[in-house]
């Protein structure tokens, strides 16, 4: 598969007057053309920071890239000129944000906001851009005449559809969806996911789906990467990772999913708390919460190694955890 995005040993820290938080610690990840990759992990794992790095949007001045690189079609996003970055954002790589209410400007109509993307990247006149915005609204299931409505006149699910229309306006090569259904109820979530699946085929875009919901990964993605404390701990095809989770953290995530069939049991949970990025433990960042960790785990983190045809894990004890 041809590489679209390549993340190489990427590390980021955030400095404040009080402390330093190590958000990403040697992330390695590849997104191929036509691939739908799920990035899953608890809140604070570094998922959104990884996505922002792809767009060279790490918040400044607190955020600092301390190592590694991110390549888009072979070129470092950190060596692109400001013009190249502006041309890439929204045109070649687009993002759907978690909360559609805060990602849309309340003082502009939805048509104007979608139209701005088209004016910038496709060089359309304002009138042409608004007309095209109306067509895009129809693609995501919103009546064309609502192009002149404001964000507050839409429901949460409709606002998220507007966000999807804006992201797809220029037919991007990569669509980043940062927990796009978190703020929506379950029935609307299903509609949005079904819409995204249809549009990914229609527009032939790659996808990075950021979520903590493993069900969404199973529904829409080909491959999945599991992130913990700013590192990738397991990666593989959805089929292999879901049928044979091998990192203790991944196994813990699957174990914490409520089961709808069989006898009622106490809901399992992962002991302890998420590693503090200001005081990361030595060795494997998960060893303090791991039931099979040894002295080796507290001293040296495992490198990623292959355990299946399309399955990789970073754990000295892979395969020793009871499922």
Enumerate the language-model features and the residues they cover.
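Conserved ABC transporter NBD signature motif
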Residues: 65-76
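Conserved ABC ATPase "signature" region
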Residues: 75-76, 116, 127-145, 254-255
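Short catalytic/signature loops enriched in Gly
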Residues: 147, 237-323
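Conserved ABC ATPase signature
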Residues: 149-154, 158
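P-loop NTP-binding/switch modules centered on Walker-like glycine-rich loops
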Residues: 176, 180, 184-266
């Amino acid at each position: 598969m041809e590489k679209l995005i390549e993340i190489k040993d990427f590390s980021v820290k955030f400095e404040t007057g009080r402390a330093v938080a190590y958000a990403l610690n040697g992330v390695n990840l590849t997104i191929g053309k036509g691939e739908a990759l799920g990035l899953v992990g608890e809140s604070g794992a570094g998922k959104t920071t990884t996505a922002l790095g792809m767009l060279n949007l790490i918040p400044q001045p607190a955020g600092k890239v301390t190592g590694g690189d991110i390549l888009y079609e072979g070129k470092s996003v950190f060596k692109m000129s400001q013009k190249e970055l502006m041309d890439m954002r929204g045109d070649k790589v687009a993002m759907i944000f978690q909360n559609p209410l805060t990602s849309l400007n309340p003082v502009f109509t939805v048509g104007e906001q979608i139209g701005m993307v088209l004016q910038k990247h496709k060089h359309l006149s304002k009138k042409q851009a608004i007309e095209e915005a109306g067509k895009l609204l129809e693609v995501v299931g919103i009546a064309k005449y609502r192009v002149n409505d404001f964000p507050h006149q839409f429901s949460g699910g409709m606002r998220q559809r507007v966000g999807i229309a804006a992201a797809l306006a220029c037919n991007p090569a990569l669509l980043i969806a940062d927990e796009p259904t978190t703020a929506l109820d379950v029935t609307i979530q299903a509609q949005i996911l079904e819409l995204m699946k249809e549009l990914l085929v229609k527009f032939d875009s790659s996808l990075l789906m950021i979520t903590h919901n493993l069900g969404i990964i199973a529904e829409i993605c080909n491959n999945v990467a599991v992130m913990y404390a700013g590192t990738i701990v397991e990666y593989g095809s959805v089929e292999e990772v879901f049928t044979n989770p091998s990192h203790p953290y991944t196994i813990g995530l699957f174990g914490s999913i409520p089961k709808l069939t069989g006898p009622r049991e106490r809901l399992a949970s992962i002991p302890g708390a998420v590693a503090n990025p200001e005081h990361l433990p030595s060795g494997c960042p998960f060893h303090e919460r791991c039931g099979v960790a040894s002295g080796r785990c507290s001293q040296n983190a495992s490198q990623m190694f292959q355990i299946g045809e399309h399955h990789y894990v970073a754990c000295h004890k892979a395969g020793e955890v009871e499922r």
